Amino acid sequence: MAIFVNEVSRTFGEYLLIPGLTTRQCTPQNVSLTTPLVRFARSQEPRISLNIPFVSAIMQSVSNDTLAIELARNGGLSFIYGSQPIAEQAEMVRRVKKFKAGFVSSDSNIRPDATLRDVLALRARMGHSTIGVTEDGSPNGRLLGIVTSRDYRIGTTPEDALVKDFMTPFSKLKVGRLGISLKEANNIIWEHKLNTLPIIDENDNLVYLVFRKDYDAHKDNPVELSNKATKELLVGAGINTRDYAERVPALIEAGADVLCIDSSDGYSEWQYDTLRWIREKYGDKVLVGAGNVVDEEGFRYLAEAGADFIKVGIGGGSICITREQKGIGRGQATAIIDVAQARDKYFEETGIYVPICSDGGLVHDYHMTLAIAMGADFLMMGRYFARFDESPTRKLKIGNNIVKEYWGEGSNRAQNWQRYDSGGSEALKFEEGVDSYVPYAGKLKDNLAQTLGKMKATMCSCGAITLPELQQKAKITLVSSTSIVEGGAHDVILKDRG
C-alpha cells in the first residue's frame, strides 16, 4: 500500500523569522557568510568552503564562464552548464581558470604585418584599447610589442600603416615573467607608472596581461574565491549520467574544482552508478555533488554512494514544471527541513558532514536567509543570476521593460540533453521547464552586495554572526495568509515611484 505523508508540504513564503537578542557584537561588518561546499570529517576542515553561500545553477541561460568569473570574484561559485558539447564546456572551465584573479588572458591580439585599419576593427569588435602584438597573432604567441590608443592618432596615422611601424616594441616594454605574484606585478605597474604589464614565459610568449585598472577592482573583492597557492578562481561544472566517462576526465583536465550531477530527480541508480564510477577511477581526489532529492531516503542513498554535497528540491524553480507535469516534488521549505535533519543524523552516526544545497523556491531575498536558517548550507539559484549583465543571454526591450531571456534545462529550448531522462535509451517526450524572461537588474556585484546586506542584517536581528550560529539560534514561525498581507504595505495609497 502507498505511504501517505500527512504533513503539509510548505514553502518559504509560509514562514518568518522571530527576532532574537541583537548584541553589540551583532553588526553586519562582523558577520561571516563562510560555509562548507563539500563533505568533511568531524574535527577536519572541508577542502572547499564558499565565502558566500551562493552558487549559480547548472543552466544554459545562467552559468557560462563570464558569470563564473564574476561570481567567484565575489565569493561564490558557478557550475558551468553541461548541456553542451564536452569540448566547449571544458573550454569555458579553462577560461575561468586562466583568469587567475587579476591575470587576464589576452583575447585581443594582432600580427605585426596587420594595419591600423585592422587594429581599429579589432578594437570596435572586442572593445579593448590594449592589443598584444604577437608573431602569429595568437593569444600566446611570441610577444613583439603592444598597441594602445597612445601609439596612433586617428586621422593622422594612415589606416594602411603597419602595426610593426607604430607599436611599442618589445625592447621598450616592461614585462613580468610567468610565476610572478599579483602583488609583484602591481608593484611594477605602480613603480613604472604603467597601465598594462605583459606577463611572458621563458620563450617570450605572451601568457597574461595585468592592468592598472584591475588593481582597485581586486581590492574591491576581498572575499574572492580562489586557490590560495595559484590564485586561480574556483569553478564547478555540471555532468550527467550518460557521457560521464568522457565528460569527467575532460573537465578535470581543464581544471574544474568540483563537479555536480545535474538532474531533476537524483534518487536513482543512474546517479549511484555515476558516483561509484568516479570514486573507483579517482578515489576522493575528484569532488562531486549529486541530487536533487527531497527526503531522508534520497539524501542517505546519495551520501552513502559518495556524494560530496547533495542538492535538495524538486519542482520549486521558477521555470521548473516537474510537479505540474509529473506530479512529483515537495514544498521546498519542508524538503530542506527534512533533509537537514537527515544530514545531522548522518553526521552523528558516521562523523561525516555532507553539506546540503537548497535548489529552487527562492522568491524573495529573505527566503535565502530562511533557507539557511532551516538548515541549508548554501543555495543554488538560476533566476536570481539570470537577471545580470554577466549571464549569457540576450538583453531585450519588451514594451517599456528591459528583460533578459531565461529558460529551464527541461525546456525544449535546452533540447533536454541528458538531464531529464530516466537513464534509459528512450528520449523524453515532454517538457519539465519553460522559456521565459526575467527583469534586467544590472551588474552582479551591485545586486549581490544588496542581497548580502539584507542577509547580514537579518542574521544580526536573529542574534547570529555566522551561518552555523543562525541555524542554532533561529526561531521560525508559520504565518497565515493574512499575516503575509499585513507584512507588506497596506491601507495606504502608494506614490508612483516613476
Report the location of each language-model feature.
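Alpha/beta catalytic cores of nucleotide-metabolism and tRNA/nucleoside-modifying enzymes
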Residues: 1-21, 108-111, 176-177, 183-187, ...
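Catalytic beta/alpha-barrel core
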Residues: 79-84, 109-110, 130-134, 175-177, ...
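Glycine-rich phosphate-binding active-site loops on the catalytic face of alpha/beta enzymes
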Residues: 73-88, 256-268, 308-326, 362-396
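Surface-exposed amphipathic alpha-helices with a cationic face
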Residues: 43-47, 72, 97, 120-124, ...
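Catalytic cores of alpha/beta
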Residues: 66-69, 244-254, 288, 293-312, ...
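Bateman/CBS regulatory modules and CBS-like beta-alpha motifs in cytosolic regions of diverse proteins
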Residues: 27-50, 57-59, 88-128, 133-136, ...
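Short beta-strand/loop segments at the ligand-binding rim of alpha/beta enzyme cores
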Residues: 47-56, 102-107, 170, 228-238, ...
